[in-house]
Structure formats: C-alpha cells, structure tokens
C-alpha cells in the first residue's frame, strides 16, 4: 500500500508552499533568544536557495553533504535543499569530537560540510590530518577565516534565486539521508533513509498524535536525531502545522517557551521530565495549551503520575529506534493507555516477541521485540556499505530484530524490559560500551576495562568504568577522567571509576556485565 502517493520531498515542499502559503511553518529560537519565523512560502524559497547554493558548489544527485550544526534554521534549509536536488544529508551529532566526526566523514563519503565557527577548528584539523573526501566547508557564521575552501553559507544562499535551478528526476526510493547511529559494535552504522521513509514518517507521526494544521509542535530535541526529524518536523510539515525548533533545552526556560509559542504538542525524554520536576513549583505550571507530550522510554509510574498531575499533561508513549524511522509501537490517539505498556503496533507494522531461535512467543513470555515493515518505506533501507550488519538485523521478508527484550499481553500491548546488549541510554543519547572500552583501553596504565550503565535519577543511566591496572601502576580519578574528556564526546565520559584486581568472567572468558551493575 502506497500511502504517500508517489510524492518525493521536492514535490512535498512545492505543494506545501502552494496550499499553506503565508501560514507560519517554522519558528527557530536560538540560545541567545533570537527568533526567526518563516511561512510555508518563505521556507520553500529558502530551501530552493539552499539547493541552488549546493548546485553552484558542484553538488549533484547522489552526493553526500555532512551537517554539523546545533538546532537552527540552516539545518532545515540544508536537509530539504539537498533532498530537492537528490543529494544526501549526513547529519553529525553536534556533541561529537574530532576522531568520531572524522570517522563519520570518512565512512559516509561526504564531499562538503556545513557547520559553524564553533566547530570549524576541529574540521580544519581533520582536513589536515585525516583522509576524507571533504573538498569544501560552508560556515553559517558571518565572519569567515581567511582559508581556502571555506565559504559563507548565508552569503552564498542569499545570492541565489528563490526558484529551483537544478531538478533532476527523483524517486521515492532515492536515498535522502544517511544517519549514523551508535550500535553495540565499536563503530556507528549508517542508517539509509529514503524519500519514502521521510514522507511516510510525516503521515504516520501526524496520525500518532492526531496532528492538525492548527497545531504547534515544539521540540528541543537535537535536529540530528531521528525523533526530531521524523516524529516532530516531518509530522508538523506534513499536516501543515507550525514547527517550533528550540536550539538548546533549558529546564528553566522550557515552560515559558511552551506558553510563548502556544504549543499544543511537544516531546520529552526522561531526563527532561526529571529536570522539569526539580524546578520550583509555579502558578504557571498548568498555563499552557499542550494536549499531548510524546514520550520515549523509560520512567517509573510514580514519576509519570507526579509529572502529569503537576503540569496537567498526558504522556503519549512511543517506542522506536533510528532503524524503524518512527515510533512503531506506541499509544494511539483516543485509545486507552495501559502504563507501563509501550503501546501497540501502529498501522503498516506487525510486531512479535521471538525466542533465541527466532520463533514467535505467546503472550506473557519474554523475548526479543521484532518488527515487520517494508525496507526503504516503513523501516530503514539498509546500513550504508555494510550488508553484513544489515543481514544480521533485517530479514528478507522485512522482519527487523531490535535487540531489545520485552513481552506482550493478550490484547496486543507490548512491554519493554531491557535495552539492547551493551548499550547505555544517557540523557537521550545512546552510548556503546564497546566503543568506550576500546578508547579507554588505549590508556598506557590500564590492563583491562569494562563499562556498564547504572541507574541515574536524572539521566536514565550513568556510566561506570571498572578497570584493572597494569602491575605496579597507580591511576588517580583526575587522570582517568581527564583522559576520557580528551578522547570522547562529553556525554560519553564515565561518571564513576572503580579500580579492581580483576573482572568477573564466565567459562569462555567473557566478562559478566550483570555482576557489575
């Protein structure tokens, strides 16, 4: 069933501009309080100018362009400007450091980068020291360094016409994005997302929260994440609603922003809910128009009840991952909700619990959560240049193995139990234990290392490192944490260190992580 009518993203934006014209499409608020507003007509024109900018820089259909940006209008311009000319966006987590960013550049084959002055020194170093295909950098800031191969994004964009100059043939099967996501291996994998995936995500996520064109969808989620793109932005635009993109989350500012923009829908992760709850009570706590708060794992029933009672909101649970594009299991609009269930499978999806032999399990039995969709349409197409990893999780008939455990009840409600092996959920970010262990193992004083997630009252899980030192060595906490801060993104740095004489292992020599939690 083709529910998108064969429409790729270029056609979507041309139609939205015609239908909604001067209606507000996008509002962006920077950390400094600067607010930019665009109507559907104006936003489509900015997208066209950006597409023309890329064309003048030699970008053609199939080329990859990396974005290393915080939440800003330029991210939206680039995302859809690239899609209009058949080029491919490669968003990079804005919190990654040099080594991690360089690896994504190398493995995505990106030939152009759009970033800000904040991140430029890192990429200048990457160009000098790492082998990449990067040939040009566009900076979104006004002031430019006197370097070759660097241009002003804004200056070049504003020189372009508002009508599209290059419009190659497009198909909904064309790749629109490669989104690198942390996995249980030491390196992230590039999730290939098509035009169809994004168009479907818009319709599906709009259905999930019964979105209308008079709604205002506000998010503080980072634009480089799938939930901001597919649960929020694509849903809002597909419904002709207003999308509000806030640059950075602030617990003190959040409710003021919800009230200021008269938001009717927003999305939260547990870290946000917990930090909002520790703010001083205010008479304005319930002075808002929110009817739904899209919510992603994991919260206790007491936390949920306290939050909903204090702020007068409803949580609409949604379960998914980058590979599923949207929240494929979740609460439905107008349907009953059964906490702590994560909901039921949405339309166009089947869901099962399977055992270790890939056999379906009956209600009440615990196993792996598996999802059936259509690759390249309702679930991701593949991992970029990684057929082995693709085959490991995606069956030929469209069944996707999530690696998460859970069970379902007799009425089809699913319940999540635990995260996939070796993953830590920290304040909305997925962190691979293996990746951290490989980095920490390079410290000259460390003989053995294991990293685990432990419960954290604010950020879901904190990261704890257990290390065995080389004989005769000593290691202070200060030295250890300084080493980590210099070699990994801040959100990956462990919070705790424990030095041990040995680590628990099973008979095959594998570390028994559960004994350390």
UniProtKB/Swiss-Prot annotation:
UniProt keyword Ligase, yes or no: yes
UniProt xrefs under InterPro entries: AMP-bd_C, AMP-bd_C_sf, AMP-binding_CS, AMP-dep_synth/lig_dom, ANL_N_sf, CaiC
Gene3D superfamilies: 3.30.300.30, N-terminal domain of ligase-like
GO biological process, one term: fatty acid metabolic process
A molecular-function term among this protein's GO annotations: medium-chain fatty acid-CoA ligase activity
Keywords: Ligase
Ligase is among the record's keywords: yes
Pathway involvement of the protein, from the record: Amine and polyamine metabolism; carnitine metabolism
Catalytic activity: 4-(trimethylamino)butanoate + ATP + CoA = 4-(trimethylamino)butanoyl-CoA + AMP + diphosphate; crotonobetaine + ATP + CoA = crotonobetainyl-CoA + AMP + diphosphate; (R)-carnitine + ATP + CoA = (R)-carnitinyl-CoA + AMP + diphosphate
Enzyme superclass (EC): ligase
EC number: 6.2.1.48
PROSITE patterns (UniProt xref): AMP_BINDING
Record-linked Pfam families: AMP-binding, AMP-binding_C
Role summary: Catalyzes the transfer of CoA to carnitine, generating the initial carnitinyl-CoA needed for the CaiB reaction cycle. Also has activity toward crotonobetaine and gamma-butyrobetaine.
HAMAP family with a match to the protein in the record: CaiC (MF_01524)
Similarity field: Belongs to the ATP-dependent AMP-binding enzyme family.
Protein name as catalogued: Crotonobetaine/carnitine--CoA ligase
Organism name: Escherichia coli O157:H7
């Amino acid at each position: 069933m083709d529910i998108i009518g064969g429409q790729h993203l270029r056609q979507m934006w041309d139609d939205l501009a015609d239908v909604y014209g001067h209606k507000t499409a996008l509002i962006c608020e920077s950390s400094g309080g600067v607010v930019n507003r665009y109507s559907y007509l104006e936003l489509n024109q900015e997208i066209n100018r950006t597409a023309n900018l890329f064309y003048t820089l030699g970008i053609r259909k199939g080329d990859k362009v990396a974005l290393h940006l915080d939440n800003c209008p330029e991210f939206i311009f680039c995302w859809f400007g690239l899609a209009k000319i058949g080029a491919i966006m490669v968003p990079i987590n804005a919190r990654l450091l040099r080594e991690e960013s360089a690896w994504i550049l190398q493995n995505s084959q990106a030939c152009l980068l759009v970033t800000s002055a904040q991140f430029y020194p890192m990429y200048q170093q990457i160009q000098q020291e790492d082998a990449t295909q990067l040939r040009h950098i566009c900076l979104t800031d006004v002031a430019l360094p006197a370097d070759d191969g660097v241009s002003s994004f804004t200056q070049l964009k504003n020189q372009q016409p508002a009508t599209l100059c290059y419009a190659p043939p497009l198909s909904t099967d064309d790749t629109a994005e490669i989104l690198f996501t942390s996995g249980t291996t030491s390196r992230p994998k590039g999730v290939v997302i098509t035009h169809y995936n994004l168009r479907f995500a818009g319709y599906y996520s709009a259905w999930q929260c019964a979105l209308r064109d008079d709604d205002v969808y506000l998010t503080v989620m980072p634009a480089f994440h799938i939930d901001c793109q597919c649960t929020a932005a694509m849903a809002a635009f597909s419904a002709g609603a207003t999308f509000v993109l806030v640059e950075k989350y602030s617990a003190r500012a959040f409710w003021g922003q919800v009230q200021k923009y008269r938001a009717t829908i927003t999305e939260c992760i547990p870290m946000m809910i917990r930090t909002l709850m520790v703010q001083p009570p205010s008479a304005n706590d319930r002075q808002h128009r929110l009817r739904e708060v899209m919510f992603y794992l994991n919260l206790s029933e007491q936390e949920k009840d306290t939050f909903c009672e204090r702020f007068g909101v409803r949580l609409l649970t949604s379960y998914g991952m980058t590979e599923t594009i949207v929240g494929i299991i979740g609460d439905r609009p107008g349907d009953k909700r059964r906490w702590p269930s994560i909901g039921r499978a949405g339309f166009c999806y089947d869901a099962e619990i399977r055992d270790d032999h890939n056999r379906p399990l009956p209600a009440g039995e615990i196993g792996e959560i598996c999802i059936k969709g259509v690759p390249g349409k309702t679930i991701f197409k593949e991992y970029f240049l990684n057929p082995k990893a693709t085959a490991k999780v995606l069956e030929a008939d469209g069944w996707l193995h999530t690696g998460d455990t859970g069970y379902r009840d007799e009425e089809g409600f699913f319940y999540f139990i635990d995260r996939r092996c070796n993953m830590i959920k920290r304040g909305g970010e997925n962190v691979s234990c293996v990746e951290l262990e490989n980095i920490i193992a390079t410290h000259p004083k460390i003989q053995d290392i294991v990293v685990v997630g432990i419960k954290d009252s604010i950020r879901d899980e904190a990261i704890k490192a257990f290390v065995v030192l080389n004989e005769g060595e000593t290691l202070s906490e200060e030295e250890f944490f300084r080493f980590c801060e210099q070699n990994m993104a801040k959100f990956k740095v462990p919070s705790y260190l424990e030095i041990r004489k040995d680590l628990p292992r099973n008979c095959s020599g594998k570390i028994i992580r559960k004994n350390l939690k």
